[in-house]
């Protein structure tokens, strides 16, 4: 059998042309369509992955924000709780301090009132005692007691220090008025002579001396000239005693007044 090479070549060319035509007009559009579809699917998958990733990021961001919000809320609640606790403690401390201050004031006021009442009663008692003593001495005063007081007065003049004598001389020697000797009762002549002699010996014989009675004196003697006075009497002793007792009571009260302040300072320090 003879091979028709022309026919074979023609068939081969036809086959190649057919393959090229199929590839160009049939397979290529199909392949392009498949590629386009694959590309579209890939793009959609990529877009879906992107959206999923974005959603995941948003979810994580939301969770982070929620966590931060929870932390902030917890911190804020803790802060508010601490502030409320501190404020409660401050208010309680303020109330306690006010209560302590009020208690101290009431205690001090009560103590002061007690001291005031005690001082008032003590003062009244002292006044009554001294008044009774003064009245008793006034009732007991007599001419004989006055004579004894005159003897004591003369002895006191003789016992004066030089500086005191000089002061009395400067006081009474310059006076041109009569020197008056006051007594509660009329003195016997002996005591008058005794006092006159003592005063002349101290002030000089030129001093004019007169004697007078003064009911306000309690067993004592007082010398008066030109507004200048010296004297010695039981009343003077009572006055001095009263002053000393009052000074002692004032000092005692001052110490008691300092005691509440000291107690208050010690309580605050503790």
Curated annotation (Swiss-Prot):
It is found in: Cell inner membrane. InterPro entries: Alt_ATP_synth_F0_bsu, ATP_synth_b/b'su_bac/chlpt, ATP_synthase_B_chain. It is a single-pass membrane protein. The chain crosses the membrane at residues 2-22. GO terms for cellular component: plasma membrane; proton-transporting ATP synthase complex. The keyword Ion transport applies. It holds the Pfam family ATP-synt_B. The keyword Transferase does not apply. GO terms for molecular function: proton-transporting ATP synthase activity, rotational mechanism; proton-transporting ATPase activity, rotational mechanism. Keywords: ATP synthesis, Cell inner membrane, Cell membrane, CF(0), Hydrogen ion transport, Ion transport, Membrane, Transmembrane, Transmembrane helix, Transport. Signal peptide: none annotated. It comes from the Bacteria. Belongs to the ATPase B chain family. F-type ATPases have 2 components, F(1) - the catalytic core - and F(0) - the membrane proton channel. F(1) has five subunits: alpha(3), beta(3), gamma(1), delta(1), epsilon(1). F(0) has three main subunits: a(1), b(2) and c(10-14). The alpha and beta chains form an alternating ring which encloses part of the gamma chain. F(1) is attached to F(0) by a central stalk formed by the gamma and epsilon chains, while a peripheral stalk is formed by the delta and b chains. F(1)F(0) ATP synthase produces ATP from ADP in the presence of a proton or sodium gradient. F-type ATPases consist of two structural domains, F(1) containing the extramembraneous catalytic core and F(0) containing the membrane proton channel, linked together by a central stalk and a peripheral stalk. During catalysis, ATP synthesis in the catalytic domain of F(1) is coupled via a rotary mechanism of the central stalk subunits to proton translocation. Component of the F(0) channel, it forms part of the peripheral stalk, linking F(1) to F(0). This is ATP synthase subunit b 1. The lineage of its organism: Bacteria, Pseudomonadati, Pseudomonadota, Gammaproteobacteria, Oceanospirillales.
